[in-house]
């Protein structure tokens, strides 16, 4: 529990973060550290503020000060991970993720971050396994789904990629990137009708119904889609 003496700087820092006054946060934390060089509130918030202003090397410096005192501090490990990610030091990112995951094996953000770092170092098969691990823990995690889909697409495992893009569309139709990427995959496979429907945000299940309707009535998939959309709008407005 945070003591009464500690509440005042925490409340002040919260207000500064809400206003995105990062320079003032840095100055405030440095003032605290002049009197108390091991003050955790100042050290942790200072590293966060440095990340926000792009001073990632400085952020890492203060994370390491914390980690010398508390080697498994989650806040410091994550800030260090984020800072290395910004600096594109992918091996260091992987190392930070491994330390976090040793203590917090269900940390989805760290799993996905490790997967991305593995992608960046060309270890795509390992990245896929990490994303699968994340999805076993959280099957509906959009970040993990998107990253495994993009990786599979890059590796030309197109049929596998489609399944993940489709799940994203089902879970969150507002993720337009899934529709675009799925359209590109179907285009690469030479399936123009499926590509058209994917671009409209249509899922595989819906696409099967539309294509069946087009076949039964002997008209184009585009026409079947337009009719389906018209009837839906008509039903909504009635």
Predicted regions and their residues:
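Structural register within alpha-helical repeat arrays
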Residues: 12, 46, 80, 114, ...
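Position-specific recognition of the canonical hydrophobic site in helix A of tetratricopeptide repeat
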Residues: 17, 44, 51, 78, ...
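Structural marker of alpha-solenoid helical repeat scaffolds
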Residues: 35, 69-70, 103-104, 137, ...
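TPR/TPR-like (Sel1-like) alpha-helical repeat modules
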Residues: 165-176, 180-209
């Amino acid at each position: 529990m945070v003591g009464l003496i500690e509440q005042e700087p925490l409340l002040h820092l919260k207000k500064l973060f809400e206003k995105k006054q990062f320079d003032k946060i840095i100055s405030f934390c440095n003032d605290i550290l002049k009197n108390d060089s091991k003050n955790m509130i100042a050290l942790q918030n200072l590293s966060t503020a440095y990340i926000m202003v792009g001073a990632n090397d400085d952020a890492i410096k203060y994370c390491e000060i914390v980690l010398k005192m508390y080697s498994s501090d989650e806040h410091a490990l994550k800030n260090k991970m984020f800072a290395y990610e910004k600096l594109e030091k992918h091996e260091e990112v992987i190392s930070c993720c491994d330390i976090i995951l040793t203590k917090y094996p269900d940390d989805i953000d760290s799993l996905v971050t490790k997967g991305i770092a593995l992608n960046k170092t060309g270890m795509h098969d390992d990245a896929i396994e990490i994303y699968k691990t994340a999805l076993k823990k959280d099957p509906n995690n959009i970040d993990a789904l998107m990253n495994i889909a993009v990786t599979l697409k890059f590796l030309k495992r197109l049929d596998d990629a489609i399944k993940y893009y489709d799940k994203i569309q089902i879970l969150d139709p507002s993720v337009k990137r899934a529709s675009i990427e799925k359209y590109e995959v179907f285009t690469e496979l030479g399936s123009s009708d499926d590509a058209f429907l994917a671009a409209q945000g249509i899922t595989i299940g819906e696409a099967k119904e539309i294509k069946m309707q087009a076949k039964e009535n002997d008209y184009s998939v585009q026409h079947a889609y337009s009719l389906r959309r018209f009837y839906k709008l008509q039903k909504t407005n009635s």
